[in-house]
Curated annotation (Swiss-Prot):
Its main location: membrane. One of its GO terms (cellular component) is vacuolar proton-transporting V-type ATPase complex. Coiled coil: none annotated. This is Vacuolar ATPase assembly protein VMA12. The modification N-acetylalanine is found at residue 2. One of its GO terms (molecular function) is oxysterol binding. It comes from Mus musculus. PANTHER family: TRANSMEMBRANE PROTEIN 199. The gene is Vma12.
Length: 208
């Protein structure tokens, strides 16, 4: 976290002999602290202009407060021209080898569990697909048997009607009587065939 400023040349000159801050009658303690901060140079390899002068925010606040109390025409932002906020380099602590190894182990376990979960879903889907195909084959065979049964039912009823109609000509002379007799016989045969067909379908559904 930033807590200091990299003092610019403007602030250094203002605090020096004959500088702008000389006539502001800075408190002795504040001047001494500022001179100590600006006189203490901090080496830094990332600074191309040479050693760095660091001034804490607390000293900057004290300086600002003093200037405001004196109603000075010298403003803080003018003194801070060329200054920058100093961000200290964050030193990362060394990682614990045991902790790193434990984290890697946990990552591997989580990856294995995720892989097993994915492959388990795929296996279940394959099994369901195989079961669906098997059930589909049974359903096709059942539908085929049902179609054959219905076809036989229609043929049987039609044959009963035709045979009765042709045979009743020796008993009835009127066509209406012959048709009625043929319908009665065909209905009886149809009901019998329907009963047998329903029982057969119940047996097949029970097997499914």
């Amino acid at each position: 976290m930033a807590s200091s400023l990299l003092a610019g040349e403007r602030l250094v000159r203002a605090l020096g002999p004959g500088g702008e801050l000389e006539r502001e009658q800075l408190p002795r303690k504040l001047r001494a602290q500022l001179e100590a901060a600006l006189g203490k140079k901090h080496a830094g390899s990332d600074n191309a202009t040479g050693p760095r002068r660091l001034v804490s925010f607390r000293l900057i606040r004290d300086l600002h407060q003093h200037l405001r109390e004196r109603n000075s025409r010298l403003y803080l932002h003018e003194l801070l021209e060329g200054s920058d906020i100093y961000f200290p380099e964050i030193v990362k602590p060394p990682r614990n080898p045991e902790l790193v190894a434990r984290l890697e182990k946990i990552k591997i376990q989580l990856a294995n569990e995720e892989y097993k979960r994915i492959t388990r879903n795929v296996t279940c889907q394959d099994a369901q697909c195989g079961g669906t195909l098997s059930d589909l084959g049974k359903q096709v065979r059942s539908v085929k048997a049902l179609v054959v049964t219905i076809f036989n039912f229609i043929i049987t009823v039609a044959a009963a009607f035709v045979c009765t109609y042709l045979g009743s000509q020796y008993v009835f002379t009127e066509m209406a009587s012959r048709v009625l007799a043929a319908l009665i016989v065909a209905s009886v045969v149809g009901l019998a065939e329907l009963y047998v067909m329903v029982r057969a379908m119940e047996g097949e559904l029970g097997e499914l």
